């Protein structure tokens, strides 16, 4: 992994797998909690009913009104979108 940020992998049935490099932050706003994931964040797994914003130098992507599952481990954030 490069020292610039984290790697984000987004998978959904419509677009398949999309990968983003050098991401600075992943902001999760779910019905029960808010979470901001950055480089070297602890390992975490969970479910999202809400939105995810992915921001970096070359990327600014938002997923709104989704139901998804996520896992963050060793500076790789995986997002599996169900709806």
Regions from the PLM with identified roles:
Residues 1-7, 11:
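N-terminal export/targeting signal detector
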Residues 9-83:
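Compact, glycine-rich, soluble single-domain proteins
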């Amino acid at each position: 992994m490069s020292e610039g940020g984290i790697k984000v992998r987004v998978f959904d049935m419509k677009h398949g797998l999309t990968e983003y490099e050098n991401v600075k932050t992943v902001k999760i706003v779910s019905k029960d909690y808010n979470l901001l994931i950055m480089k070297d964040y602890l390992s975490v797994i969970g479910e999202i009913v809400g939105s995810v914003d992915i921001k970096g130098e070359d990327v600014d992507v938002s997923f709104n009104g989704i139901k998804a599952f996520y896992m963050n481990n060793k500076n790789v954030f995986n997002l599996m979108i169900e709806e």
